[in-house]
């Protein structure tokens, strides 16, 4: 039996990174082999691609270029880090995966979800998460959180106007409906302690 692949999705400021940092020690304490990682990134090549994608000055980046860079980073991360961990029966907690591309590039950028999905099917060879937690939050609330977080670097996507971030959320909600068999929507506009408790319960009920 292979490991379990859990992805955490959500718009900017939804609390994904903070949530994963809390989930990691919880499952480690339960003697679970667990690994946390992120997209784009997780390994050297993909972190370099992340730097390119997030550079504020690269406002000229075209939507298809953006989609292909995310897919390239995803492929390398998958084969170099995620798949080996799953083969070793780890619980892998990943900050973003394919659903981000569907919401951001497929819907918000207007490339079409089906086209972006096919690009990523090629990149992932149909390796899909066992479970996805989607942290839902109003764009205004998420962006306000980012502004208050002095330790978080503002990236190119953060700088998009509010209409873009609203489209991202609309895209995510369509993705949730399309893949309702593996995606669970959780309200992210609640205290982090309650959010952690809810997500832990979902993971344990569905997978462990």
From Swiss-Prot:
One MF term in the entry's GO annotations: dTMP kinase activity
Keywords for this protein: ATP-binding, Kinase, Nucleotide biosynthesis, Nucleotide-binding, Transferase
Keyword Transferase: yes
Organism: Bacillus cereus (strain B4264)
Protein name listed in UniProt: Thymidylate kinase
Binding, ATP: 10-17
InterPro entries recorded: P-loop_NTPase, Thymidylate_kin-like_dom, Thymidylate_kin_CS, Thymidylate_kinase
Family as reported in the entry's similarity comment: Belongs to the thymidylate kinase family.
Lineage: Bacteria, Bacillati, Bacillota, Bacilli, Bacillales
């Amino acid at each position: 039996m292979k490991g379990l692949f859990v992805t955490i999705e959500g718009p900017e400021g939804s609390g994904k990174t903070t949530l994963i940092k809390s989930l990691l020690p919880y499952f480690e304490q339960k003697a679970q082999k667990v690994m946390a990682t992120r997209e784009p990134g997780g390994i050297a090549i993909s972190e370099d691609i992340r730097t390119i994608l997030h550079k504020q000055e690269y406002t000229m980046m075209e939507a298809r270029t953006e989609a292909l860079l995310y897919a390239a980073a995803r492929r390398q991360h998958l084969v170099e880090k995620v798949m080996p961990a799953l083969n070793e029966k780890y619980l892998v907690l990943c900050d973003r995966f394919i659903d981000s591309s569907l919401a951001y590039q497929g819907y918000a950028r207007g490339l079409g979800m089906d086209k972006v999905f096919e690009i990523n099917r090629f990149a992932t060879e149909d390796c899909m998460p066992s479970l996805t937690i989607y942290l839902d939050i109003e764009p205004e609330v998420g962006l306000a959180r980012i502004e208050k977080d002095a330790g978080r670097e503002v990236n190119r996507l953060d700088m998009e106007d509010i209409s873009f971030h609203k489209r991202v959320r609309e895209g995510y909600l369509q993705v949730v409906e399309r893949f309702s068999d593996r995606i669970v929507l959780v309200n992210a506009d609640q205290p982090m302690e309650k959010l952690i408790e809810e997500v832990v319960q979902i993971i344990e009920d569905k997978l462990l």
